[in-house]
From Swiss-Prot:
Component of the nexin-dynein regulatory complex (N-DRC), a key regulator of ciliary/flagellar motility which maintains the alignment and integrity of the distal axoneme and regulates microtubule sliding in motile axonemes. Plays an important role in the assembly of the N-DRC linker. Plays dual roles at both the primary (or non-motile) cilia to regulate hedgehog signaling and in motile cilia to coordinate cilia movement. Required for proper slow muscle development and positively regulates ciliary smoothened (SMO)-dependent Hedgehog (Hh) signaling pathway. This is Dynein regulatory complex subunit 4. Residues 20-104, 142-200, 242-426 form a coiled coil. InterPro entries: GAS8 (IPR039308), GAS8_dom (IPR025593). GO terms for molecular function: microtubule binding; small GTPase binding. Keywords: Cell projection, Cilium, Coiled coil, Cytoplasm, Cytoskeleton, Flagellum, Golgi apparatus, Microtubule. Component of the nexin-dynein regulatory complex (N-DRC). Interacts with microtubules. Pfam families: GAS. Residues 1-22 are annotated as: Disordered. One of its GO terms (cellular component) is cytoplasm. Residues 1-113 are annotated as: Regulates microtubule-binding. It comes from Danio rerio.
Length: 475
């Protein structure tokens, strides 16, 4: 039943409906009027209930959205915590790798020490062999001196025995001996010339073949090394530049998303204020509901965009960490290569100085030996000529002396030829080593003018052009 009407105060003007007051209406008109009022009341109640339901829905949706926001914040904190843990684990792994690198460097240092010790031992062995060879040469010189002394004694005895012969045979013997000496000299000169030409041709052929093989191999290795180094440097440079640009763009997008999120938070506050105002006016509430629905759609869209952006940011951070790790590894490798280059440069400089000293000393010794032998040979030839000119020899004794003289001359010529070849080979190896070292220094970008010494170039006999250090090592 409808609620009872309150009694109107006295003197109140009666209600007018359709131009008639309620007192003037009939019963049927009053009933119709009451029915209309009841229908209007029902409509107003239905509208009130509808707006209350809409208000409850909006409030519920706001609560759900707030809970989702809190859950997302919790998830974001968890993700940040996980990222911190991953970063800590990554730092631990980096320390482990650094320790491994230290161990590898220590092993490399030990290996270099062993190689250095082996090189010292091999150098000592070579020095011992050189000393033994020098001792053998001194023994040969002593035996040769003894033979010459014996020959002098025998010549003196022969001179005493044949001094009593006639003076007429002296002239014939001198002429015959001069003729034989000239024939022997021409014969052995032709033979020596032929042997020199054959040995020179064979040596030049071998040197040329070795030069071609080694130069081809060295050029191929240098080209492959330069190509590989250039490719890997270009590859990592492109990767670093591309990822830096991508990280910068993603950071800018993240800043923009944060601004949008702040804007959406402000809009949510405004929505709460608008919900309070819904109680005042139903029409205003309808308009605000439509506006809120639009804002909600925009919020969902921005929320999905923010989720995708965070995923992209996470992926970019992971890629950036990987690139940082690769960059650190490359920097370590680069520093290691620089250290190796400096060590090789120091060793190379030291080796050049040692080779210069050894080759200079060896050249000096060989030249001194050669000069000594030449002087000795000239003296002996002069003494022998004087003895022969002052004595009268029979043909048998003369043939014996001539045969021994030929043997002595042949051995001396062989010794002189070997010493000359050794001097020329050492000079050539020294000069080619200087050329090869200068080429290597230019290949590594080190100017030759910055060396702390002046390379000593030998002026010895040339035996061909090419990497003669390989010939010397093989010999």
């Amino acid at each position: 039943m409808p609620p009872k009407r309150k009694s109107s105060p006295k003197g109140k003007t009666p209600t007018v409906v359709d131009g008639l007051s309620t007192e003037e209406m009939s019963k049927e008109q009053l009933e119709e009027h009451i029915m209309r009022l009841r229908e209007e009341l029902d409509r107003e109640r239905e509208e009130r209930n509808y707006f209350q339901l809409e208000r409850d829905k909006i409030h519920t949706f706001w609560e759900i959205t707030r809970r989702h926001l809190e859950e997302n914040k919790c998830e974001l904190r968890n993700r940040e915590r996980e990222l911190e843990e991953v970063e800590e684990r990554h730092q631990v792994e980096i320390k482990v790798y650094k320790q491994k690198v230290k161990h590898l460097l220590y092993e490399q240092q030990n290996m270099l020490s062993e190689l250095k010790a082996e090189s010292i031992i091999s150098t000592k062995l070579l020095q011992d062999e050189h000393a033994d060879l020098e001792k053998e040469q001194w023994k040969d010189m002593r035996s040769l001196k003894l033979e010459l002394k014996q020959q002098e004694l025998s010549s003196e005895n022969v001179l005493k025995r044949i001094h009593l012969k006639h003076d007429e045979e002296t002239t014939d013997l001198r002429n015959d001996f001069a003729r034989q000496v000239q024939e022997i000299g021409s014969k052995y000169e032709k033979r020596m010339q032929k042997l020199r030409q054959e040995e020179e041709l064979r040596r030049k052929t071998e040197i040329h073949e070795i030069e071609e093989r080694k130069n081809t191999h060295i050029n191929m290795l240098m080209k492959n090394h330069e190509k590989a180094f250039r490719d890997i440097r270009n590859y990592f440079s492109d990767i670093v530049y591309k990822n830096l640009d991508l990280i910068t763009s993603l950071k800018e997008e993240l800043k923009e998303m944060k601004k949008n999120e702040e804007k959406r938070n402000k809009e949510m506050a405004e929505v709460l204020e608008q919900n309070k105002e819904l109680k005042e006016s139903s029409q205003k509430a309808k308009e605000q509901v439509a506006e809120l629905q639009k804002q909600l759609a925009n919020y969902e869209k921005d929320k999905s965009i923010l989720t995708r952006s965070r995923a992209r940011l996470k992926m970019s951070d992971r890629e950036m960490k990987e690139l940082k790790w690769e960059l650190e590894v490359l920097e370590q490798r680069f520093s290691k290569v620089q250290l190796e280059r400096d060590e090789l440069y120091m060793k190379f400089t030291k080796a050049i100085l040692e080779v210069q000293q050894k080759s200079g000393f060896k050249n000096l010794l060989l030249e001194c030996k050669l000069n000594t032998l030449n002087d000795t040979l000239e003296k002996k030839e002069a003494q022998l000529s004087e003895v022969l000119s002052a004595s009268n020899l029979d043909p048998t004794t003369l043939s014996v002396v001539t045969h021994k003289l030929e043997e002595v001359l042949e051995s001396k010529n062989h010794t002189i030829k070997d010493l000359q070849y050794e001097v020329a080979r050492v000079c050539k190896a020294h000069n080619d080593l200087l050329k090869t070292s200068e080429a290597k220094l230019r290949a590594f970008g080190i100017p030759v003018e910055e060396l702390c010494f002046e390379p000593l170039k030998s002026n010895g006999q040339s035996v061909g052009q090419g990497p003669a250090m390989f010939v010397s090592s093989s010999n």
